[in-house]
Each structure stands twice: as C-alpha cells, then as structure tokens.
Design a protein with these regions (language model features):
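Acidic/polar N-terminal loop/beta-strand segments that form early-domain functional surfaces
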Residues: 1-4, 75
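A short glycine/small-residue-enriched secondary-structure motif
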Residues: 3-4, 26-38
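Glycine-rich loop at the start of a catalytic domain that most often binds anionic cofactors/ligands
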Residues: 3-20
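Active-site loop segments of alpha/beta catalytic cores
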Residues: 15-31, 42-290
Length: 290
C-alpha cells in the first residue's frame, strides 16, 4: 500500500515515523489554500516518494518468492482522501462547502500525481487497486460523496483500467451503507467493506453487481478477541454472504493494527480455508451453520 498521505509527505508535509505503525502526517504541505505552488508534478516520482519506492521493492520481493501462488497488488489511495492530506482534513471538509473550486483543483492535481506513480507499478506488471477512507459516510454525506469523491474514484479507475483492460476494486472505510449502490454504479468490480456494514444487507443491495469482501472487525475482534472468537467472526461473515451472486471472499474490515496476536491471524486463516472449501462445494449445509 502506498499510504494515505505519502503524496502530501513527499510534497513537504511534516510527519512522524513511529516504530509500531506507518508514517503519520502531522502538518499538511499547503498552509494557504490560495497558494498551491507546491503542487508540482515534477516533484512526484519514485526517487522522491520513499513510500512508493519501498512498496515497489517489497512487491518485487513478494513476486519473486510467492508470485506463482498469489497476485501481488499495489493500492493507491483515491484523490479525495489524498487531497484531504494536502491541506488537512478539517480544512478540506470546510473547502467542500466554502471553496469547492479549489478543492476540485487539488483533486485534479492528485489524480495526475497518483496515476503518475501508479504507472511505475503497472509498467512492471503489478495490479493496482484503490481505497478512499475519507469518502466514508462516517465523515461525509452521501451527497458529498457523489459530488466530490465518486467522480475522482471513477476517473482514477478509468486511467488504471485503460492500462490493464481490467476493472478495479475499491475499499472505503467506515459506514458505507447509503452509498453501496453508488459504488456499484461507479463500475467497481469488487468492494471491500468495513465492519460497520452488514454483509447480508450488502449482499441484498449490490451482491448481484459487485464481488463482496469483508468484514471481520480488525480491532474489536482481530486485535482484542481470542482465536475462538476470531473463528466465529469469520464463520459469521461466510454465513451472511457466502452465496452472494457475484462472489464473496473473507477479508478484514480494514487494515490490521500492529500487534494483532499471531494466534488470531492463524485462526482467521485456518477457519477461512475451511469455510472457503465448504463454499466451493455449494452444498446446503456448511460449517458456519453449526
């Protein structure tokens, strides 16, 4: 993953780099929204963006070691979320109301910058997906999503698809129930949902239009519960969505925090293998029904 705010950091944003988590943006590169001079595509490249370079090296290593078994994919954050890091999240949300033209100008730049970086990975044969955490209805309204976030998700996806000939999947954090149909309308082939979304309801609303992924709670279950409780959570996800018309795969609701017990990860994987085997049989009785 490229990181939510790797581009703002590359453009001069101040950050901290803790030992136990990813880099955290603490001050955006743009201090005055009427001065966007730092938004220069000449400063967007693999040499200056250490996060992109490190991710590329890691993907190359993964492909060499396990590339015959799994697909190695890079995730680039969508323009809406990245733009929020250019000026700061609070200021960006204010701009959606008071300065929408400037907000759009920033997202235009981010669209070009993110695709410029993505091309390095595409040219080397890696798949590219996207995510848009700040586009969550836990942060913005469905109307704002449709007006500001969705058009740039579509634009970025079209750029990638034009290169690969394949549609993209997307992840959006938080509550997304009210925009499920919008995400499907955007043309995404798959949708990774956070644990706030009910998989059974998502299946009924858009299961015939998108491949669904989800959505074991990464903190409340994976980090805080026992292996037995993790196993039950995995089974519950399968129980709700195993027969989704366009397909289903188990997934965490979002990124796992540092320090998740190894036993919980193993319980997740082992239970998922059993459930996926049952799912493939497509028989009326499954392990999650007991």
């Amino acid at each position: 993953m490229h990181g939510l705010y790797s581009l703002p950091i590359t453009l001069g944003g101040e950050y901290v780099d803790p030992d136990n988590t990813t880099r955290t943006l603490v001050s955006p590169p743009v201090k005055d929204i009427h001065d966007l001079s730092v938004l220069d595509l000449d400063n967007v490249n693999m040499e200056k963006d250490t996060a992109a370079r490190n991710a590329f090296d890691a993907l190359c290593y993964m492909r060499e070691e396990i590339g015959e078994e799994v697909n190695c994919t890079m995730n680039f954050t969508a323009p809406f979320t990245v733009a929020s890091g250019i000026v700061g999240v609070e200021m960006f949300l204010i701009m959606l109301v008071r300065e929408p033209e400037i907000a759009s100008k920033i997202m235009d730049f981010v669209l070009e910058a993110q695709f410029k970086l993505a091309e390095y990975f595409l040219k080397d044969g890696f798949s590219v997906g996207t995510s848009d955490p700040i586009a969550s209805n836990s942060v913005i309204s469905p109307r704002q999503y449709r007006q500001f976030a969705m058009p740039y998700e579509i634009a970025f996806a079209k750029r990638i698809s034009a290169y690969t000939g394949k549609p993209l999947g997307i992840h959006i954090c938080g509550q997304t129930r009210k925009i499920l149909k919008d995400v499907a309308d955007a043309g995404f082939v798959s949708f990774s949902m956070d644990n706030m979304v009910d998989l059974a309801e998502a299946k009924e609303l858009v299961g015939d239009r998108m491949y669904l992924l989800g959505n074991v709670d990464p903190v409340g279950v994976m980090y805080q519960k026992t292996p037995e409780e993790v196993s039950e959570a995995v089974k519950n996800c399968y129980h709700k969505a195993w027969d989704s018309p366009m397909g289903f795969a188990i997934h965490n609701g979002c990124d796992l925090p540092a320090g998740v017990p190894k036993e919980n990860i193993l319980a997740y994987m082992e239970t998922a293998k059993i459930c996926a085997t049952d799912m493939a049989k497509a028989e009326p009785e499954h392990i999650w029904d007991y």
